[in-house]
């Protein structure tokens, strides 16, 4: 059973693309060689938020290389955002709240209920949306900076 403050193994791995989310029950399938290869791949960019503890816990099961991982918490301050939680960063960037009511749920349950599945998928999807929004901000800053340089040369 789940208890607040108790350290648990990473039970669930959430992966999101722009149109799909995949939930891997690590407590059921384990940390497979395929998952380890995924994290070790230089070709696949992995976007994470608050992943340090999760990677530490995963490495207790099986040492995995972490290549091409973009950790949002390491760069979010560069965008003038001091918050580090997914919910707060999302609210700042999009002006909308995402629910975190299932956070203290039992992720090792035999079956995840629909609320848990939606929470986990939303968590992964929101992380990807944050990353894509940061890229948009970066591009806008580049365009603005370029325009500013051109306007001062006239």
Residue ranges of predicted features:
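Mixed-charge, glycine-rich, non-catalytic linkers/tails in nucleic-acid processing enzymes
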Residues: 118-154
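Conserved DEDDh/DEDDy metal-dependent 3′-5′ exonuclease domain
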Residues: 3-100, 104-119, 126-133
């Amino acid at each position: 059973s789940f208890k607040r403050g108790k350290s648990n193994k990473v039970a669930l791995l959430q992966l999101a693309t722009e149109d799909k989310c995949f939930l891997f029950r690590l407590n059921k399938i384990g940390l497979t060689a395929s998952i380890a290869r995924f994290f070790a791949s230089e070709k696949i960019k992995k976007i994470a938020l608050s992943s340090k503890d999760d990677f530490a816990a995963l490495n207790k099961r099986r040492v995995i290389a972490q290549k091409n991982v973009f950790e949002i918490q390491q760069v979010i301050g560069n965008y003038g955002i001091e918050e580090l939680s997914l919910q707060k960063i999302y609210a700042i960037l999009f002006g909308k709240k995402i629910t975190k009511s299932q956070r203290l749920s039992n992720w090792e349950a035999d079956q995840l209920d629909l609320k848990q599945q939606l929470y986990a998928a939303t968590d992964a999807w929101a992380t990807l949306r944050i990353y894509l929004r940061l890229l948009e901000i970066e591009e806008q800053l580049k365009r603005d900076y370029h325009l500013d340089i051109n306007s001062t040369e006239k």
